């Protein structure tokens, strides 16, 4: 078929992705080495797809808050990593339109959390203790779209180091989610927003900050990604276009002790167009609280506190109508506003 259809004609092929057998057959012909044009078309979700993704995340948020209520009630009763994975699947399965998990659940307690893509099985499964963190990276396919979320939960009293590091990761998540940027930037330009707070403390994470997410397809899907390394071919960071959905997942991993990752899904939207150019922004799709008890509030500036409070207020507003009275009371507690620092200015201040 190749010979019949392509004799004397150039062939468009993505050399980084085709298999070696096809490459050998194409080698003697004229090859136009280009990314599959449908890749970008898939990545740029249309208005209906973005709206449906928002609906999927509401369902996911409802299921996740119900799971958090269960977690809060049972953390002292000897639950395991697999118990958490199974409970999340149970709650998601109750949602209309649920199809399946979008990937194998990552539930990692304590030192397991420092293994970036650890997944529990019967041999490795451990019981949570009343200390440290459990890192939970899970997702689902619904008829409306795909979700991918990571939350790291405190299992008891945390050390100052643990709370400080959680807060550094949170600062990165908030900064990237709040980005306002000129059209034409790639993930490589934006990555520093998520890492800056960690870098200032000599910390980092050895994975990308974000990956493209498909619409009821692959949970990892290009060409958009957010990583600072300047790659080539399939690793080249694409221009972030309106409609592209990308994960926002900074983290920090302390070998032998714990791991922290906080992941939301964000969609790129047009912000404004003026004499300086086209400006983009992100809208966060994920609707699940952060663990407010794991945050060192003193490390947040006033803008970060505002972002956190606004996010939690929105979570409460959207999810609360779908909960029973006890779950609502619980949600009110875990989305409570953090206090701002009110400065008393001198009477002769010109500010």
Where are the predicted features?
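Conserved small/polar residues in nucleotide/adenosyl-binding loops
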Residues: 1-5, 341-347
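Flexible, acidic/His-enriched mid-domain "rim/lid" segments that flank
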Residues: 5-100, 110-112, 153-167, 171-182, ...
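Acidic/polar loop patches that form or flank catalytic/metal-binding clefts of enzymes
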Residues: 12-13, 99-100, 177-191, 203-209, ...
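Flexible glycine/proline-rich, aromatic-decorated loop/lid segments
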Residues: 25-33, 139-154, 161-169, 213-224, ...
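Short, basic/aromatic beta-hairpin or loop at an interaction surface
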Residues: 101-114, 209-226
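Acidic/histidine-enriched ion/cofactor-binding microenvironments in catalytic or ligand-binding pockets
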Residues: 114-144, 221-273
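Intrinsic disorder at enzyme termini
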Residues: 279-339
């Amino acid at each position: 078929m190749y010979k019949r259809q392509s004799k004397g004609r150039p062939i468009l092929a993505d050399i980084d992705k085709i298999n070696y057998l096809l490459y050998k057959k194409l080698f003697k012909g004229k090859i136009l080495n280009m990314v599959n044009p449908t890749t970008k078309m898939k990545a740029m979700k249309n208005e209906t797809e973005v709206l449906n993704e928002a609906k999927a995340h509401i369902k996911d948020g409802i299921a996740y808050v119900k799971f958090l209520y269960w977690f809060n009630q049972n953390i002292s009763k000897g639950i395991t990593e697999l118990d958490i994975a199974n409970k999340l699947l149970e709650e998601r399965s109750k949602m209309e339109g649920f199809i399946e998990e979008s990937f194998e659940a990552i539930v990692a307690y304590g030192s397991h959390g420092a293994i970036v893509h650890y997944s529990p099985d019967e041999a490795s499964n451990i019981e949570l203790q009343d200390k440290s963190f459990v890192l939970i990276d899970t997702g689902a396919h619904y008829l409306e779209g795909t979700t991918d979320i990571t939350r790291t939960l405190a299992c008891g009293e945390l050390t100052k180091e643990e709370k400080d590091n959680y807060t550094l990761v949170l600062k990165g998540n908030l900064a990237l989610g709040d980005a306002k940027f000129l059209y034409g930037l790639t993930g490589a330009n934006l990555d520093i927003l998520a890492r800056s707070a960690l870098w200032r403390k000599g910390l980092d994470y050895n994975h990308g900050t974000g990956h493209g997410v498909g619409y009821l397809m692959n949970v990892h899907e290009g060409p958009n990604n957010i990583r600072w390394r300047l790659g080539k071919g399939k690793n080249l960071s694409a221009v972030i276009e309106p409609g592209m959905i990308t994960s926002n997942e900074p983290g920090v991993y302390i070998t032998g002790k714990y791991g922290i990752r906080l992941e939301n899904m964000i969609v790129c939207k047009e912000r404004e167009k003026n004499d300086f150019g086209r400006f983009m922004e992100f809208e966060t799709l994920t609707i699940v609280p952060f663990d407010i008890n794991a945050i060192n509030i003193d490390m947040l500036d006033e803008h970060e506190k505002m972002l956190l409070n606004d996010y939690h207020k929105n979570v409460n507003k959207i999810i609360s109508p779908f909960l029973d009275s006890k779950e609502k009371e619980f949600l009110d507690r875990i989305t409570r506003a953090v206090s701002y620092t009110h400065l008393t200015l001198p009477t002769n201040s010109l500010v």
